[in-house]
Every structure is written in C-alpha cells, then in structure tokens.
Amino acid sequence: MAKKSWIVRAQRPPKFSVRAYNRCKICGRSRAYIRKFGMCRICFREHALKGLIPGVVKSSW
C-alpha cells in the first residue's frame, strides 16, 4: 500500500507535464501499472480471479 502523501501528490497536476505518472486506482502502487485497466498487476490479478473485470479469463494451455 502506498503512502497517502504519495497518492495525493500523484493526483494533483505536476509543474511540468513530463513529471506525470500513473498509479493504481485501488492501492496506489506506481510500479507494474497496466494502463488499459488503470491498476497494478497485483490488483488486476485479484479482480480478474474474482471475476470483477469483464472479458478477462485465466489462460491455460
């Protein structure tokens, strides 16, 4: 879980546009962010296994 200060800092507009970065909407994690779903890999996996993300199925071959 990210610190509240980092989450708040990421939400406000940066002084320069290059400084903007993505954070997970659920936990605030900045690394392993999946743009299409707006969350980190850990939250993505949890939500996918619970069936909360439509169209995502676990792959097996």
UniProtKB/Swiss-Prot annotation:
GO terms for cellular component: cytoplasm; small ribosomal subunit. One of its GO terms (biological process) is translation. GO terms for molecular function: rRNA binding; structural constituent of ribosome; zinc ion binding. Pfam families: Ribosomal_S14. Its cofactor is Zn(2+). Transmembrane segments: none annotated. PANTHER family: 30S RIBOSOMAL PROTEIN S14, SMALL RIBOSOMAL SUBUNIT PROTEIN US14M. This is Small ribosomal subunit protein uS14. The lineage of its organism: Bacteria, Bacillati, Chloroflexota, Chloroflexia, Chloroflexales.
